[in-house]
Amino acid sequence: MAEQAHDLLHVLLFPFPAEGHIKPFLCLAELLCNAGFHVTFLNTDYNHRRLHNLHLLAARFPSLHFESISDGLPPDQPRDILDPKFFISICQVTKPLFRELLLSYKRISSVQTGRPPITCVITDVIFRFPIDVAEELDIPVFSFCTFSARFMFLYFWIPKLIEDGQLPYPNGNINQKLYGVAPEAEGLLRCKDLPGHWAFADELKDDQLNFVDQTTASSRSSGLILNTFDDLEAPFLGRLSTIFKKIYAVGPIHSLLNSHHCGLWKEDHSCLAWLDSRAAKSVVFVSFGSLVKITSRQLMEFWHGLLNSGKSFLFVLRSDVVEGDDEKQVVKEIYETKAEGKWLVVGWAPQEKVLAHEAVGGFLTHSGWNSILESIAAGVPMISCPKIGDQSSNCTWISKVWKIGLEMEDRYDRVSVETMVRSIMEQEGEKMQKTIAELAKQAKYKVSKDGTSYQNLECLIQDIKKLNQIEGFINNPNFSDLLRV
């Protein structure tokens, strides 16, 4: 009887189609498979074709299944996920396809597919339509937030900022301070720290209001899952707990796993052997993430600043990181620079393993949320170079609140880069090493059996079962062994 109940549990996960969202969703998919669920991972057709190592993931998790649906754009058209038109296309085109997919699992018997009907949906927090469809079909739905609790709370505070007259701001000053958001954020948040295109809001626009409505609709879900932990963001988790039925802080989610997942970029593992040849804490790791683009001039300023610092560095040079037509010439110039064993350039790196390597002593980062959590978990101080989205406020918290990194902001010149690299790898970095080491210790405890992130994950699993009114389920006896504790 217990096995029959076990076989009925089928969770569908649907992330926003960007690496920074897909990665933590894949982590959650693996964790739910470890707990004994059938899991369907839903991606766009475009990104599904780009995923690497799917066969390895499928072999490790037989209960994990992949589906894909159209995002409304032709296969050969570039995807600009920051363009409101792309977001609108997904919401309009994908909604009926999503509904049909859920219905198809009801129509086709589990004997034919080997999988039961969908009994729970976990959707990206910035999507409203999966909640609409799940409610229509009477399927329990949860929202998963892949950015910080702080940034999530700002979505709910934007209407109050409009009411108070702080938005829109006609003077064009994106550094204008915002007040009344929360005591712990007073004097720290600026207009450019707001979600979406609100950072540049000199008038109210429909796409801005729609983006907020899409995300705040997540409060209708059965609960909010967050990739964070309470010691890091306790005040904002507390505020979100007054908005949502339930919250589950399960971060750093990658630290709950013993295995590594696939992604949209092919990792070059040769850099790990190179790191083996370097002294402890002697290497600066440089990566602008999966989405950020910089100009050729900015790239060369970073490059020469790193060279002038005299420190060893590992540079992730994504194939599409440079804006403009002179990308090939700039990249050629970099690769023709004599390394003399001091540096290495790769197209994409296994970031978690790199940060965890004893040779890495600093991280020059775009300050995406996944990168921050991975750096904290590894105990590596950061140089923060924010560009888009939540990265600006992340930078403020790294440098001013948590004091685990330096704030570069818009100073993309070689002198600033050289100065900050020297600082993070020398005297100032030593102080931050102690601070972030303590935070890393807390993060490690949170994902242990006695930690709140581990317990919140178990609570989520139990709540999914309860919402499906399945009782007598016997926990996977190997579940604890499959987690990194």
From Swiss-Prot:
This is Mogroside I-E synthase. The keyword Transmembrane does not apply. InterPro entries: UDP_glucos_trans, UDP_glycos_trans_CS. The keyword Lipid metabolism does not apply. UDP-alpha-D-glucose binds at residues 290, 351, 369-371, 374, 390-391. The gene is UGT720-269-4. Mogrosides, the major active constituents of S.grosvenorii fruits, are a mixture of cucurbitane-type triterpenoid glycosides that have been proven to be powerful and zero-caloric sweeteners and can hence be used as a sucrose substitute for diabetic and obese patients. UDP-glycosyltransferase involved in the biosynthesis of cucurbitacin and mogroside tetracyclic triterpene natural products (e.g. siamenoside I and mogrosides IV, V and VI). Cucurbitacins have cytotoxic properties and exhibit deterrent taste as a defense barrier against herbivores. Mogrosides are nonsugar highly oxygenated compounds used as high-intensity zero-calorie sweeteners; they also possess pharmacological properties such as regulating immunity, lowering blood sugar and lipid levels, protecting the liver, and acting as antioxidants and antitumor agents. Belongs to the UDP-glycosyltransferase family. It holds the Pfam family UDPGT. Keywords: Transferase. The active site is at 21 (proton acceptor), 124 (charge relay). It comes from Siraitia grosvenorii (Monk's fruit). Pathway: Secondary metabolite biosynthesis; terpenoid biosynthesis. Highly expressed in young fruits 15 days after anthesis (15-DAA). One of its GO terms (molecular function) is quercetin 3-O-glucosyltransferase activity. SUPFAM superfamilies: UDP-Glycosyltransferase/glycogen phosphorylase (SSF53756). Its EC number is 2.4.1.350, 2.4.1.-. It catalyses: mogrol + UDP-alpha-D-glucose = mogroside IE + UDP + H(+); mogroside I-A1 + UDP-alpha-D-glucose = mogroside IIE + UDP + H(+); mogroside II-A1 + UDP-alpha-D-glucose = mogroside IIIX + UDP + H(+); mogroside II-A + UDP-alpha-D-glucose = mogroside III + UDP + H(+).
